[in-house]
């Protein structure tokens, strides 16, 4: 159900509270998921005119789970705070003295419900942390992370019995990784259609038993960061080592991600240097180039009255990854009506060369390769 449809069914006197939750409500580490409401119901009689829903189920993303809490207002007394039912978490009993925004409920503040939900989620986090006492090993993992503020202050935990019959205990740690994304080139961050939200990397580590013999890590990137780093398949984190600890494993993943970010930033500046060198060396032979991301360059060149194009595609992780050179005859066509072309990646190249050296080496390679390309174009293409 979309937020607008849901709000149209809410009692008008309660609408400001719920609107703040579903439109602006981001609670916890996962900034890519908003709060949402379902199961709208009314405690009013059927004779009540207009929208009258005053109770609903609130879905809250937390540590890779979705908490489903029932929130119950009274549409006849909209200035009163709501009641809460915590679904399957019957053992969760919040401390009323710590719910300041509930104790001093201010119906003139449209964010008062959201503020209470945030306080409840904080208490729920403490409740989940306390459950780790059932496993000394998992409690050790938690306490060692807690000693490091960069991890301890950005962590969510979901713990409990995976199987009520066997009593088997499991837990999931969700950590917001302290990785700086601020220097990623803006052109890489703008091609995401949806609301990008915060640029964030979350590491989920699931312990399937209390002794940590089965541990499954997974990395989640916000949409813009995933796009900037080359898609979901571009980053593979290492398996959790047998006998390893989170306090050792998490920094390794942070370093891996930081290195990826640095590769992308370096690649952008190196591509710009590369294209600037080609503009200098080939001058009027440059037909077009990508002036934003510096990922493409096209040259129109001539060798002994034979005109040809060279399309250069520079990869995201340039100069580590070698550019592709595609030679294209301006005279010859394939059977499908396309200009005859050949792509080359087997040519002299070193990622250690600067842009000027790469341009000089490319010019020398063109002179050696064009004769055989011309011969192939005449042999295989059609005029």
UniProtKB/Swiss-Prot annotation:
GO BP: any one term: apoptotic process
Keyword hit for DNA damage: yes
Annotated region described as UEV-like 1, given as residue ranges: 30-147
Subunit: Component of the ARISC complex, at least composed of UIMC1/RAP80, ABRAXAS1, BRCC3/BRCC36, BABAM2 and BABAM1/NBA1. Component of the BRCA1-A complex, at least composed of BRCA1, BARD1, UIMC1/RAP80, ABRAXAS1, BRCC3/BRCC36, BABAM2 and BABAM1/NBA1. In the BRCA1-A complex, interacts directly with ABRAXAS1, BRCC3/BRCC36 and BABAM1/NBA1. Binds polyubiquitin. Component of the BRISC complex, at least composed of ABRAXAS2, BRCC3/BRCC36, BABAM2 and BABAM1/NBA1. Identified in a complex with SHMT2 and the other subunits of the BRISC complex.
CDD domains xref list: BRE
Region (UEV-like 2): 275-364
Organism: Gallus gallus (Chicken)
Primary location recorded for the protein, binned into one broad class: cytoplasm
Pfam family for this entry, one: BRE
Function: Component of the BRCA1-A complex, a complex that specifically recognizes 'Lys-63'-linked ubiquitinated histones H2A and H2AX at DNA lesions sites, leading to target the BRCA1-BARD1 heterodimer to sites of DNA damage at double-strand breaks (DSBs). The BRCA1-A complex also possesses deubiquitinase activity that specifically removes 'Lys-63'-linked ubiquitin on histones H2A and H2AX.
Origin: domain of life: Eukaryota
GO MF: polyubiquitin modification-dependent protein binding
Keyword Cell cycle: yes
Protein family (similarity comment): Belongs to the BABAM2 family.
Domain notes: Contains 2 ubiquitin-conjugating enzyme family-like (UEV-like) regions. These regions lack the critical Cys residues required for ubiquitination but retain the ability to bind ubiquitin.
Protein name: BRISC and BRCA1-A complex member 2
Gene this chain is encoded by: BABAM2
Localization per record: Cytoplasm; Nucleus
Residue spans crossing the bilayer: none
Cellular component GO terms, alphabetical: BRCA1-A complex; BRISC complex; cytoplasm; nucleus
Keywords assigned by UniProt, alphabetized: Apoptosis, Cell cycle, Cell division, Chromatin regulator, Cytoplasm, DNA damage, DNA repair, Mitosis, Nucleus, Repeat, Ubl conjugation pathway
